[in-house]
Amino acid sequence: MKNIQGAVFDLYGTLYDVNSVAQVCEEVYSGHGDSISRLWRQKQLEYTWLRSLMGRYVNFEKATEDALRFTCTHLGLSLDDETHQRLSDAYLHLTPYADTADALRRLKAAGLPVGIISNGSHCSIEQVVTNSEMNWAFDQLISVEDVQVFKPDSRVYSLAEKRMGFPKENILFVSSNAWDASAASNFGFPVCWINRQNGAFDELDAKPTHVVRNLAEMSNWLVNSLD
């Protein structure tokens, strides 16, 4: 991968653990933390896909809040305004994966420009990064807000070329979400899929360039391939 001049990362589920919200959910709804977290994330993604198809964009915070309301209604849990705000705020305080910081340090030390490209709004991306004290790691924070549509629309991925300043074939796209990795590959990025769960890749006719188990493996492979 000697032609790689920059790398862009998905945020939710790739650099940051979306299931870290389960702890807050458990504090509020004892015995339901994991089920809330899983269904909430599922509906959050579904709402972004459906809104893109319907042409009814809202920012990621609104999609996340709506998904939470559905989740609590579906599970028969009451949701007052204070609890709704507390749980929604948990998405602004996500926990980075244990290997996130070290992996990004390796890329920065190698002189590689690094960005985030996310469904999150500009505000939410900045808050997640700031709250985890990771501002040092990123040269660009790229939001779908600029095109008013969510991944996997190709207009989102085209933002990386504009903001990173390199053609797509020179930008490594990194995601743990198979659907996202497939769409990025279809767009024309070289893609590294972080397969943490040892799962099967989606059958969408567009495959990743490289598959690893975690971010540590990704950084080792990428830095060594740049030499």
From Swiss-Prot:
The annotated site for Important for catalytic activity falls at: 14, 151, 157
Entry keyword annotation includes Hydrolase: yes
Q: Which domain of life is it from?
A: Bacteria
* Gene Ontology terms for molecular function: (S)-2-haloacid dehalogenase activity
Q: What is its EC number?
A: 3.8.1.2
Answer yes or no on keyword Hydrolase: yes
Q: How is it used?
A: (S)-2-haloacid dehalogenases may be used for the biodegradation of halogenated substances and their derivatives which are widely used as pesticides, herbicides and other industrial products.
Outline the segment boundaries, as ranges, of region: Important for catalytic activity: 175-180
* Active-site residue numbers: 10
Q: Which residues bind an (S)-2-haloacid?
A: 11-12, 41, 118-119
Pfam families annotated for this entry? Hydrolase (PF00702)
Q: Which SUPFAM superfamilies match?
A: HAD-like (SSF56784)
Stated family = Belongs to the HAD-like hydrolase superfamily. S-2-haloalkanoic acid dehalogenase family.
Sum up the protein's function in the record's words. Catalyzes the hydrolytic dehalogenation of small (S)-2-haloalkanoic acids to yield the corresponding (R)-2-hydroxyalkanoic acids. Active with 2-halogenated carboxylic acids and converts only the S-isomer (or L-isomer) of 2-chloropropionic acid with inversion of configuration to produce R-lactate (or D-isomer).
Report what the protein is called: (S)-2-haloacid dehalogenase
Q: Which organism is it from?
A: Pseudomonas fluorescens
